[in-house]
Structures are given as structure tokens and as C-alpha cells.
Amino acid sequence: DGNRNVTTYTYDDQNRVTGVSRKNGNETISNSISYDMGADGKTTTSVKDANGHVNKEVTNEAGLTESTTDLGDGEEQITTAYSYDTNGNKIRETYADGGYKTFDYDRKNRLIKTESYEAGEAGESIGEKTLKTVYSYDINDRLLESIDYQIDGAEETTVRYTEYQYDRRGQTTGYAELSQENAPTADEIKEHQIRYHYDSDGKLTKVTYPTTKNGVQALAYEYDQNGWLTKIKGEVQSADTSTEKTVRSYTYDS
């Protein structure tokens, strides 16, 4: 990358990643990944980081994640379980503390609502609802808007709007998050919008931000003649001047 850090990947005979090493100067940080298929057809993927912390993911024969477990340092396990409908849509996440989140879909299998609940009282399977998000789409099934609500008993308060825009190819050209109760105007959306630009081949060439982050106003992407990403440059804003700085570069073998 731009700081001359090198990331190396290793693979098994099934082209699955088994190791990731990142060299930063004289320090190398490595993660190892292992896979175990049980007699029931389920696969357990274990990721061990440089500190010895282990995360496990169990997937079924359909490739759907049934559970994830953070083993941490071995003293406490934190597990999240997942369930699905007959179409493979995730319909519930259940957390280690007993809280859970539900997912609803329309006839097109588009996500239209999520609801979050606290753990139920002793002997009760349904907890108190705390959050709700609803999603809307255009005629091409592209996500146009999501609205987040905070729930307190029977009272719902709008807390966030997320807006999306697309070009004729269906590529995202605008994304905006607005934390407010009232529906945003077009000007408010524009003021908070991240914008995405593409070349004639549909490759992302630039991302511009409504506000600077660490001085970066935009990111530009460069490609080689084969269409492979070779460089990411940051447009750094300082006082009245703007300069470009390479933040990451990529090389490929033959």
C-alpha cells in the first residue's frame, strides 16, 4: 500500500484462503484460517489472529451461516445464531444475551423490514422491540431508501434516513445518511451525499465526499490495460490547496 506495507495470502488445494500475513516494517502480523467439514455436511471455518483469538463460523450444506462464535481468549464464548426461510432468506439473528433481530421480505424476496428486540423476560419468548428499519425499492428492485425508527413502547421516532441513487447501468451514484426526524429534501440529500463516478466500462474512477475525512475530499482509482486496479489516490484538501497522494497500490503476478 502507500505506506509500503505488504499483505500476503496463502491458499489450500481448494483455493481457500488459509493464511493472511501483513508486514509493517520489521513487524509481521499473521492470521491463520482452517476448515473442518463434519459428517452432517456442515463446515466450520476457524480464524485465529496474531493474539491467539479465535472466531468460528458454521455453514450448512447450502452455504448459509448457521452460527458465528467469538472465542476471544477462551474465557468466554459469544455466539450468534441464524435461521432462514425456505427461500434461503435470513429471518432471524439470535444473540448471546438473548436479544434478537427479525427480517421480513416481500414476494420478490426483497428485504422490507427489520426489527430488533431485547431479550424476553423469564418465561417469555418475545422481548421488547427497540428498533425498526423499513426499506423501499424502485421498479428495477434497486434499494432507494431505508428509514430507521427508535421504538419506546408504542412510540416510534424516526432517527435516520438513508438515500440511494443509481445510473442507467444500475451502479450506485449517490449515497446519503441523514440523522433527522423529517423526510429530507433534495437539497439536504445533496449536501450529505457521497458520489460515485465511473468510466465508460463501468469501472469506479472516483468517489467524492461531502466533508473531508483526515483531509481527504475524494479518492481516485486507476487501472491497467487489463482493467485491474493498480492505484488509489487521495485528494487531500488543505486550506485553499488540493493535492493528490497515493494511498494504496496493487501489483499482480502473471
Regions found by a protein language model. Name each.
Residues 1-254:
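Beta-strand elements of repeat-based all-beta scaffolds
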